[in-house]
Protein backbone atom coordinates (compact mmCIF):
# COMPACT_ATOMS: atom_id res chain seq x y z
CA UNK A 1 0.00 0.00 0.00
CA UNK A 2 1.38 3.37 -1.04
CA UNK A 3 1.45 6.04 1.60
CA UNK A 4 0.30 9.43 0.43
CA UNK A 5 1.88 12.69 1.43
CA UNK A 6 -0.10 14.32 4.21
CA UNK A 7 -2.70 16.77 2.98
CA UNK A 8 -1.86 20.35 3.94
CA UNK A 9 -4.12 21.99 6.47
CA UNK A 10 -6.75 24.34 5.09
CA UNK A 11 -4.82 27.29 6.50
CA UNK A 12 -1.59 26.12 4.84
CA UNK A 13 -3.45 25.50 1.58
CA UNK A 14 -4.82 29.04 1.70
CA UNK A 15 -1.30 30.43 2.21
CA UNK A 16 0.16 28.38 -0.64
CA UNK A 17 -2.63 29.31 -3.06
CA UNK A 18 -2.45 32.97 -2.02
CA UNK A 19 1.32 32.90 -2.55
CA UNK A 20 0.83 31.63 -6.10
CA UNK A 21 -1.99 34.08 -6.87
CA UNK A 22 -0.05 37.04 -5.46
CA UNK A 23 2.84 36.03 -7.73
CA UNK A 24 0.67 35.54 -10.80
CA UNK A 25 -1.70 38.50 -10.38
CA UNK A 26 -0.25 40.71 -7.66
CA UNK A 27 -1.32 41.30 -4.09
CA UNK A 28 -3.70 44.14 -4.89
CA UNK A 29 -5.35 42.31 -7.80
CA UNK A 30 -6.03 39.12 -5.83
CA UNK A 31 -9.29 39.04 -3.88
CA UNK A 32 -10.50 36.88 -1.00
CA UNK A 33 -12.88 35.24 -3.49
CA UNK A 34 -9.98 34.41 -5.84
CA UNK A 35 -8.11 32.66 -3.03
CA UNK A 36 -11.20 30.88 -1.67
CA UNK A 37 -12.03 29.63 -5.18
CA UNK A 38 -8.45 28.40 -5.71
CA UNK A 39 -8.58 26.49 -2.41
CA UNK A 40 -12.13 25.27 -3.00
CA UNK A 41 -13.62 26.59 0.23
CA UNK A 42 -16.47 28.92 1.11
CA UNK A 43 -15.76 32.52 1.99
CA UNK A 44 -17.03 31.81 5.51
CA UNK A 45 -14.44 29.07 5.94
CA UNK A 46 -11.86 31.43 4.48
CA UNK A 47 -12.70 34.16 7.01
CA UNK A 48 -12.38 31.61 9.82
CA UNK A 49 -8.66 31.38 8.98
CA UNK A 50 -7.90 34.95 7.89
CA UNK A 51 -9.80 38.10 8.80
CA UNK A 52 -7.94 40.52 6.54
CA UNK A 53 -5.87 40.47 3.39
CA UNK A 54 -2.96 41.84 5.40
CA UNK A 55 -3.16 38.76 7.64
CA UNK A 56 -2.75 36.56 4.57
CA UNK A 57 0.07 38.73 3.25
CA UNK A 58 2.04 38.32 6.48
CA UNK A 59 1.65 34.54 6.24
CA UNK A 60 2.63 34.54 2.56
CA UNK A 61 5.77 36.54 3.33
CA UNK A 62 6.65 34.15 6.17
CA UNK A 63 5.97 31.21 3.82
CA UNK A 64 8.25 32.66 1.13
CA UNK A 65 10.96 33.37 3.69
CA UNK A 66 10.77 29.79 4.98
CA UNK A 67 10.90 28.39 1.42
CA UNK A 68 13.89 30.62 0.67
CA UNK A 69 15.71 29.50 3.81
CA UNK A 70 14.97 25.88 2.97
CA UNK A 71 16.40 26.36 -0.50
CA UNK A 72 19.53 28.07 0.84
CA UNK A 73 20.01 25.29 3.39
CA UNK A 74 19.64 22.65 0.65
CA UNK A 75 22.26 24.42 -1.47
CA UNK A 76 24.61 24.50 1.51
CA UNK A 77 24.29 20.72 1.80
CA UNK A 78 24.49 20.08 -1.95
CA UNK A 79 27.51 22.25 -2.68
CA UNK A 80 30.75 21.26 -1.02
CA UNK A 81 32.47 24.47 -2.10
CA UNK A 82 31.32 28.09 -2.40
CA UNK A 83 31.59 27.81 -6.19
CA UNK A 84 29.28 24.78 -6.21
CA UNK A 85 26.82 26.62 -3.97
CA UNK A 86 26.90 29.69 -6.22
CA UNK A 87 26.19 27.38 -9.15
CA UNK A 88 23.07 26.22 -7.29
CA UNK A 89 21.93 29.86 -7.18
CA UNK A 90 22.58 30.23 -10.92
CA UNK A 91 20.77 26.96 -11.66
CA UNK A 92 17.72 28.17 -9.75
CA UNK A 93 17.58 31.20 -12.04
CA UNK A 94 17.91 29.01 -15.12
CA UNK A 95 15.27 26.56 -13.88
CA UNK A 96 12.79 29.37 -13.18
CA UNK A 97 13.68 31.56 -16.14
CA UNK A 98 10.35 31.23 -17.99
CA UNK A 99 8.25 32.14 -14.96
CA UNK A 100 10.58 34.99 -14.06
CA UNK A 101 10.49 36.34 -17.62
CA UNK A 102 6.69 36.13 -17.68
CA UNK A 103 5.86 37.22 -14.11
CA UNK A 104 9.04 38.76 -12.73
CA UNK A 105 11.03 37.79 -9.66
CA UNK A 106 8.61 36.54 -6.98
CA UNK A 107 10.30 38.59 -4.29
CA UNK A 108 11.06 41.63 -6.43
CA UNK A 109 7.55 41.99 -7.81
CA UNK A 110 5.99 41.72 -4.36
CA UNK A 111 8.46 44.25 -2.91
CA UNK A 112 7.84 46.66 -5.79
CA UNK A 113 4.07 46.38 -5.46
CA UNK A 114 4.12 46.87 -1.70
CA UNK A 115 6.42 49.88 -2.10
CA UNK A 116 4.00 51.46 -4.62
CA UNK A 117 1.16 50.86 -2.19
CA UNK A 118 3.27 52.20 0.70
CA UNK A 119 2.22 49.02 2.49
CA UNK A 120 3.55 48.49 6.02
CA UNK A 121 4.72 44.95 5.13
CA UNK A 122 7.18 46.09 2.47
CA UNK A 123 10.10 45.85 4.90
CA UNK A 124 9.20 42.29 5.86
CA UNK A 125 9.02 41.28 2.19
CA UNK A 126 12.38 42.96 1.55
CA UNK A 127 13.96 40.80 4.23
CA UNK A 128 13.77 37.87 1.81
CA UNK A 129 16.26 39.71 -0.41
CA UNK A 130 18.34 40.03 2.75
CA UNK A 131 18.36 36.25 3.09
CA UNK A 132 19.81 35.91 -0.41
CA UNK A 133 22.22 38.79 0.14
CA UNK A 134 23.64 37.34 3.36
CA UNK A 135 23.91 33.85 1.88
CA UNK A 136 25.65 35.09 -1.27
CA UNK A 137 27.99 37.29 0.78
CA UNK A 138 28.95 34.27 2.89
CA UNK A 139 29.92 32.38 -0.27
CA UNK A 140 32.19 35.23 -1.30
CA UNK A 141 33.71 35.37 2.21
CA UNK A 142 34.51 31.67 1.90
CA UNK A 143 36.15 32.43 -1.45
CA UNK A 144 38.44 34.89 0.35
CA UNK A 145 36.63 38.06 -0.76
CA UNK A 146 36.03 39.26 2.80
CA UNK A 147 36.26 43.02 2.17
CA UNK A 148 33.94 43.15 -0.81
CA UNK A 149 31.69 40.13 -0.12
CA UNK A 150 28.56 42.24 0.42
CA UNK A 151 29.19 44.37 -2.68
CA UNK A 152 29.70 41.22 -4.75
CA UNK A 153 26.51 39.71 -3.32
CA UNK A 154 24.52 42.83 -4.21
CA UNK A 155 26.08 42.92 -7.67
CA UNK A 156 25.20 39.27 -8.27
CA UNK A 157 21.62 39.81 -7.11
CA UNK A 158 21.22 42.81 -9.41
CA UNK A 159 22.84 41.06 -12.36
CA UNK A 160 20.79 37.91 -11.82
CA UNK A 161 17.58 39.91 -12.14
CA UNK A 162 18.75 41.67 -15.29
CA UNK A 163 20.12 38.51 -16.94
CA UNK A 164 16.74 36.82 -16.72
CA UNK A 165 15.47 39.16 -19.42
CA UNK A 166 18.12 38.22 -21.99
Q: What is the predicted role of each segment?
A:
Residues 84-85, 99-120:
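Amphipathic alpha-helical segments used for helix-helix packing
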Residues 22, 31-32, 42-43, 53-64, ...:
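Amphipathic alpha-helical segments enriched in hydrophobic/aromatic and basic residues
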